[in-house]
């Protein structure tokens, strides 16, 4: 009897763990798709630092925008995204999605080479969340000149 209970507990734990680590949904933070079962003990939001670029930094066409920083969480991260959007028309210029289950600290680094014929304003948005639905978002503006 003990053996059967042990197997049942292991199977239940495995199913719950698989559900908690599902890859469903998007990293937009809109909860527009399936999301893992939230962790009721995870109440602290991740800490997000964006090192580069700086807010309102000016680039010239052909320059590379490097987006670097660090995300940490006390109980582990779930997923995130980094996006560069053209403010004039809403075009998504670059998107990097992350699934980094239960990682406590992650250094991110992506690059985007700019090409413009007229001065353009871009928004850089960095978003990450943990398994408790807690999230951290930072957005900043940059300008690209021809």
Predicted region positions:
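Extracellular acidic, Ser/Thr/Pro-rich low-complexity tracts
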Residues: 57-58, 67-75, 86, 130
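Aromatic sugar-binding surface patches on proteins
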Residues: 100-111
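Proline/serine/threonine-rich low-complexity linkers at boundaries of modular beta-sandwich domains
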Residues: 28-49
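Hydrophobic/tyrosine-rich beta-strand signature of extracellular beta-sandwich/beta-rich modules
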Residues: 124-126
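Surface-exposed, short loops/turns at beta-strand junctions within beta-sandwich domains
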Residues: 114-121
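C-terminal edge beta-strand
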Residues: 36, 138-144
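C-terminal motif of bacterial Sec signal peptides marking the signal peptidase cleavage site
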Residues: 17-20
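Short, solvent-exposed loop/turn segments at the edges of extracellular beta-sandwich modules
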Residues: 25, 128-134
